[in-house]
Design a protein with these regions (language model features):
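Hydrophobic alpha-helical transmembrane segments and adjacent short intramembrane/lumenal linkers
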Residues: 100-208
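Individual transmembrane alpha-helix segments
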Residues: 52-84
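Interfacial/capping segments of alpha-helical transmembrane domains
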Residues: 12, 16-44
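Hydrophobic core of alpha-helical transmembrane segments in multi-pass integral membrane proteins
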Residues: 11-12, 204-215
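Alpha-helical transmembrane segments and their helix-start/interface "positive-inside/aromatic belt" motifs
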Residues: 1-10
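Small-polar-interrupted transmembrane alpha-helices in polytopic inner-membrane proteins
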Residues: 15, 70, 85-108
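Short juxtamembrane and helix-loop transition motifs at transmembrane-helix boundaries
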Residues: 44-56, 80, 90-94
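Short, highly charged, low-complexity non-transmembrane loops/tails of multi-pass membrane proteins
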Residues: 225-242
């Protein structure tokens, strides 16, 4: 997870610096239509108006399905020895870097964080973790260790699948946040209708989401390992015999 996070942050940084040095980079990554729409919304005093378009439930279904699809592609990218997984991280990293730069360049950086990262904290973290699952699968193929390659592959595939399945509820919650909560928060910065959520609500959601990701996927596994626990083939947590 640490390796995947560092690589993803590197790709995001490349996206930011590329946007800073090439005005057309943002349009090339996000598309002219999206950039033009965002600039029109900013000019109208409703910079995050895109999150108010459409039926919330329809958005919830589509966003949830799309995010799970991206995660699944990152997972099966492990069958390509991690190359396709890396490609997905590259594309999403550049997109995120260009996307955030667009708002910071308009003086809307902090506001964009308070609105977009309500759902983005869980969504982006889950995609990075899904990529980690892809690399676990690739590692089982490339580095069998003392196991036969077929056995190593099966072990890697099983571990990676468990990680991927654990992400499904997170993607569902992220889709709910984007469709309903981000929808409300976007109204906070609508000059014509600033009846959205208070800033403190956004900060609380961001903090809780980030704390959950760090605790469940980083701290908790480390603590289990230090206490001598391990995960059985059937997924049950057990303790090593002393």
């Amino acid at each position: 997870f640490l390796f995947t996070s560092v690589v993803f942050i590197l790709f995001v940084t490349i996206g930011v610096f590329s946007s800073m040095n090439n005005e057309e980079f943002v349009r090339g990554v996000l598309g002219d239509g999206y950039v033009d729409m965002t600039e029109e919304n900013i000019a109208k005093g409703d910079p995050f108006g895109v999150y108010k378009d459409g039926n919330p439930f329809s958005m919830f279904v589509w966003i949830g399905f799309n995010n799970i699809s991206v995660a699944f592609k990152a997972f099966i990218g492990g069958f390509t020895l991690g190359l396709f997984t890396m490609w997905i991280m590259w594309g999403n990293g550049l997109m995120l870097g260009a996307f955030q730069f667009m708002f910071f360049a308009k003086g809307l950086g902090i506001k964009s964080v308070l609105v977009i990262w309500i759902h983005g904290t869980l969504e982006i973290s889950a995609i990075v973790i899904a990529a980690t699952a892809g690399f676990i699968l690739a590692s089982g193929i490339l580095f069998p260790g003392t196991y036969a390659r077929s056995v190593s592959f099966k072990r890697g595939a099983k571990d990676a699948a468990k990680v991927l399945i654990s992400l499904v509820p997170i993607f569902i919650v992220a889709a709910f946040f984007e469709s309903y909560i981000t929808h409300l928060m976007s109204q906070t910065y609508d000059k014509a209708n600033n009846t959205g959520l208070p800033v403190w609500a956004s900060v609380c959601i961001l903090s809780v989401s980030l704390t959950f990701i760090i605790w469940y996927f980083v701290i908790y596994p480390i603590r289990l390992h230090k206490k001598g626990y391990y995960i059985q083939p059937d997924g049950i947590i057990n303790r090593l015999k002393k």
